[in-house]
């Protein structure tokens, strides 16, 4: 594994832990050259799953897109990277259990919103505003009112 700081190829594993659901391994590594530490994640490569976009286009499932969306929604919120990784792992596992070959982007978005709503309401509203394409203040108010009623 190449060091992200000095680009050295040689590093040693300092600590390894399974994710909460066992779908990935988190490894702390130390670079042999610069001695800085960094984290890597290892997971099993799964069978191909296609995502059907709103316009009907199909593209390969990319868990990084889900993680990036969750990370943007959780920016400056008390949600750790490990929690975000666990959310993505949970979503990916559910998708692979429910769908064999293809899944709609709408189904993925709903799963993300469900998990964010349970974890952090501000992150949920942030994600929903982009996912549901809020165009005015009333859209935000309606979503917040729905959260208050739960």
Swiss-Prot record:
Entry's cofactor comment: Binds 1 zinc ion.
Task: Give the keywords, sorted.
Answer: ATP-binding, DNA-binding, Metal-binding, Nucleotide-binding, Repressor, Transcription, Transcription regulation, Zinc, Zinc-finger
Entry keyword annotation includes Repressor: yes
Q: Where is the ATP-cone domain?
A: 49-139
Pfam assignment, any one:
ATP-cone
In its UniProt record, which GO terms are filed under biological process? negative regulation of DNA-templated transcription
Q: Which domain of life is it from?
A: Bacteria
Cofactor(s) essential for the protein: Zn(2+)
Single GO molecular function: ATP binding
- Zinc fingers classed as unnamed: ranges: 3-34
Checking InterPro entries in the record gives:
ATP-cone_dom, NrdR-like_N, RNR_NrdR-like
Q: Which family does it belong to?
A: Belongs to the NrdR family.
Give the matching NCBIfam families.
Answer: transcriptional regulator NrdR (TIGR00244)
- Job description of the protein: Negatively regulates transcription of bacterial ribonucleotide reductase nrd genes and operons by binding to NrdR-boxes.
What PANTHER family does the record tag this protein with? Answer: TRANSCRIPTIONAL REPRESSOR NRDR
The name under which this protein is listed is: Transcriptional repressor NrdR
Q: Which organism is it from?
A: Syntrophomonas wolfei subsp. wolfei (strain DSM 2245B / Goettingen)
């Amino acid at each position: 594994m190449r060091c992200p700081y000095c680009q050295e190829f040689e590093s040693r594993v300092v600590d390894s832990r399974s994710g909460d659901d066992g779908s990935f391994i988190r490894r702390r590594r130390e670079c042999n050259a610069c001695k800085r530490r960094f984290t890597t994640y290892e997971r099993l490569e799964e069978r191909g799953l296609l995502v059907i976009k709103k316009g009907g286009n199909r593209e390969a499932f990319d868990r990084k897109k889900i993680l990036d969306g969750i990370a943007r929604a959780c920016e400056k919120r008390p949600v750790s990277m490990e929690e975000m990784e666990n959310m993505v792992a949970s979503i990916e596992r559910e998708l692979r259990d429910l769908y064999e070959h293809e899944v709609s982007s709408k189904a993925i978005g709903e799963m993300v919103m469900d998990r964010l709503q349970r974890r952090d309401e501000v992150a949920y509203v942030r994600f929903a505003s982009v996912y549901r394409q809020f165009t005015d203040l009333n859209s935000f108010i309606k979503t917040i009112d729905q959260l208050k009623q739960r």
